[in-house]
């Protein structure tokens, strides 16, 4: 795996596991989300579709694994706006 610099400070996002109460979120189409258990893997993505307990997210290759689209369970996704985390993502 190549070691490239990520465009955002994804390493500063809090790790939130699926069994934690903060993992119970209402997510809708268009929300910016990240993968709670390991934010660096997927990066930040936009929700494209929500079907029952699954969510289709376009990560646009922003994480260290360069994943573009994936389907994940809602309990693994944390919305950026809910925790007001946008200030953590800016370059210093």
Residue ranges and their predicted role:
Residues 2-19, 61-92:
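Intrinsically disordered, low-complexity, charged/polar segments
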Residues 18-26, 39:
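Short, surface-exposed secondary-structure edge patches
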Residues 2-7, 29-32, 37-72:
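Basic/aromatic-rich interaction segments and small domains that mediate binding to polyanionic partners
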Residues 17-20, 32-34:
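A general structural-boundary detector
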């Amino acid at each position: 795996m190549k070691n490239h610099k990520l465009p955002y400070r994804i390493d500063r996002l809090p790790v939130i596991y699926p069994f934690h109460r903060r993992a119970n979120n209402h997510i809708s189409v268009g929300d910016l989300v990240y993968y709670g258990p390991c934010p660096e893997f997927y990066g930040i993505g936009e929700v494209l579709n929500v079907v029952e307990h699954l969510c289709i997210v376009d990560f646009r290759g922003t994480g260290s694994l360069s994943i573009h689209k994936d389907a994940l369970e809602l309990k693994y996704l944390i919305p950026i706006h809910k925790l007001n985390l946008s200030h953590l993502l800016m370059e210093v």
